[in-house]
């Protein structure tokens, strides 16, 4: 058996199946689109699910992939095992080959045998093969067993197991079938190898590959007409086998990352081995963090974002347990990017975003970690004092809500101290909030989509790319939740046409408005949406006459409004290109709104955009507009578009054919470059034909809308012109108010500000003079208490600093005295006590003087022996407190 690096294993697997007629399909994003049952891709077959279910056709019938996977929730939840286990991970790579009704068991097993024994050169005598033993519903998979033996497997090492281990189902319906797993014995002593070790907890037996044979329909358990194959080989486990180690953390996939943790902390081997679980967990979590952020997930409180937050905060806490006091994850993640960046270029491309987003989240958590740990320790002590072993669920919820502690982190810390957490109570504390969220979501989905589904209408034919007015037939209508055959004047309706030029809200672009004119009436269309895939629904009101199902209508889009929308949509694409040119390729779209009056673009960037950068972005956009370059679109293959550098929206699911919108860069203008390359984006929206149609672009705001997400709002065309006119009018009005011309406005404002500063200084000087005169009058009110000069008085002061200045002025004037001043500042009593140095040496103390006085006004205070101050809640008691200074000083001086 040859030793191979993980990269060599990946390449060997892919190239082997490519040579055997398989199409190499790149890994899909970790973010699974259009599948509410999955947050993340957790196996290689996820991106082919619709192919296996017969919902989607691909131009190939056999494929090979190296798929990014994440398992952190649901049935496939490895999070708690990560660290203590030598082989469990959150993020991992799954190598797989697939047949979509092409080859089946015979070729799949032959290919597997050839790869394992000839390419990887695994020792046959250490390999075990399992097949389905059969049950009352499904016969045993004798075919697979015979095929393994025919390839050369020892019959005694072909074992049979039941459904738990060797039968695969996708769900209650869909394809299912037996699977055949390949296990390798990695123990040092071959004589100890036993059949009982397969599918056991014995660490000497490692499952390296699973071949799933989809041959039955789950609903009927009848054979499928075109059986398929789905296989999965975990790269991490295969690397462990090929590199002769007993833990995936000892492979080249992890060694460099763990070494970086050791280096960053300044650890030694002894410390690593004493805290190995924590080091491993950090290394694993760093990989998950890097890939999640690269695939567009940022830390947050919902869904995928919360999973990332949980993983990152677990890693930060693990760092705390091994001695990290400051943020360290960015250093560790850098090692991940360096190691995995060649195989997954998105890591390099989004390096800045990955590092800054992770560092920002870690710092945010560390600010609350100490307080949370203190709170949790207090809860633990209370639980133990009651003689209990369970942390109440409500306390766990408070830790999450106030300190950002995910439940699993609280459970981990509790387990370290021999306690558990009341999960039911935790869920109960969140139940009301969850119920509200579910109700809101259900209300949003509503029953309209179900009504349209019941009508079973054909998909609408969209003609809005080519024309803005078209003949169409009304094929369906709803009103107030009921199916209608006709509607009269004043009725609000939702209408479906067989053909329509109206664009339905999608991809951030809002829906068209316009008019439907039929033989007996007309409908004002106020919005257009798509409640079901392929179904375009027009929302409007019958403005005259009657509209009926079956009517032939002229459907006309509001052309002025559509033109405004198109200007903003094309400008949105240009804005993304300009942001990437100025800020870096990490500035990727995180959301957008394309409306007739404005555009809004959300993008990934972890700090405010510098005003100079924002100005450069706007300048680039307007140069591009003046260049009047061509905007075109085409239907092309997804892989071809991506190979040409097209930008796809994170988390969006695309078919094999896509619509590619290109905004040409054209020639650099004499006034300078405006784009580094053409803008290429996958987009179904509507656009102008040339950038010059946009007129010009004005960015009106930029700000943060969440962790690592910025938002720009901009105007184009008529909207930008209106904004400029509004600003000009504002300048004219300002100029008129200060009796100048707009061109001299800045100069005039500077002069007014200078005059204001001068008047303010003069006023301040006058106030100081008056204050000193007031204080000088107080000098005559000095009284002697036990031989100590005392000045106690209530004064007027607008701040504590002013009160302090007064006290210091009197101290300097008196030279040898105790001074007690009081003032009402912002409605609250404030006290100041000063003891000159010679009296401090005699034993007097300003702090001891102010505390009893502060108690009289319902407060407290502190300071130094020479000067102290205090505040309180009862301004009506201030005079009494000042009067009590004589008695308090007498007590001290006596």
Swiss-Prot record:
Copy the domain comment. Consists of three domains; the N-terminal catalytic domain, the editing domain and the C-terminal C-Ala domain. The editing domain removes incorrectly charged amino acids, while the C-Ala domain, along with tRNA(Ala), serves as a bridge to cooperatively bring together the editing and aminoacylation centers thus stimulating deacylation of misacylated tRNAs.
Instruction: List required co-factors.
Output: Zn(2+)
Give the GO cellular component terms, alphabetically: cytosol
Q: Which UniProt keyword terms apply here? A: Aminoacyl-tRNA synthetase, ATP-binding, Cytoplasm, Ligase, Metal-binding, Nucleotide-binding, Protein biosynthesis, RNA-binding, tRNA-binding, Zinc
Residues binding Zn(2+) are: 569, 573, 683, 687
Instruction: Report the family membership.
Output: Belongs to the class-II aminoacyl-tRNA synthetase family.
Question: Matching InterPro entries, A to Z?
Answer: aa-tRNA-synth_II/BPL/LPL, Ala-tRNA-lgiase_IIc, Ala-tRNA-ligase_IIc_anticod-bd, Ala-tRNA-synth_IIc_core, Ala-tRNA-synth_IIc_N, Ala-tRNA_ligase, Ala_tRNA_ligase_euk/bac, DHHA1_dom
User: Which GO MF terms are attached to this record?
Assistant: alanine-tRNA ligase activity; aminoacyl-tRNA deacylase activity; ATP binding; tRNA binding; zinc ion binding
Show the Pfam families listed in the entry: DHHA1, tRNA-synt_2c, tRNA_SAD
Question: What does the Swiss-Prot or TrEMBL cofactor note state?
Answer: Binds 1 zinc ion per subunit.
How is this protein named in the record? Answer: Alanine--tRNA ligase
Entries under Gene3D superfamilies matching the protein: 2.40.30.130, 3.10.310.40, 3.30.54.20, 6.10.250.550, Bira Bifunctional Protein, Domain 2, Threonyl-trna Synthetase, Chain A, domain 2
Q: Where in the cell is it found?
A: Cytoplasm
Recorded superkingdom? Bacteria
**Which EC number(s) does UniProt give?**
6.1.1.7
The EC class name is ligase
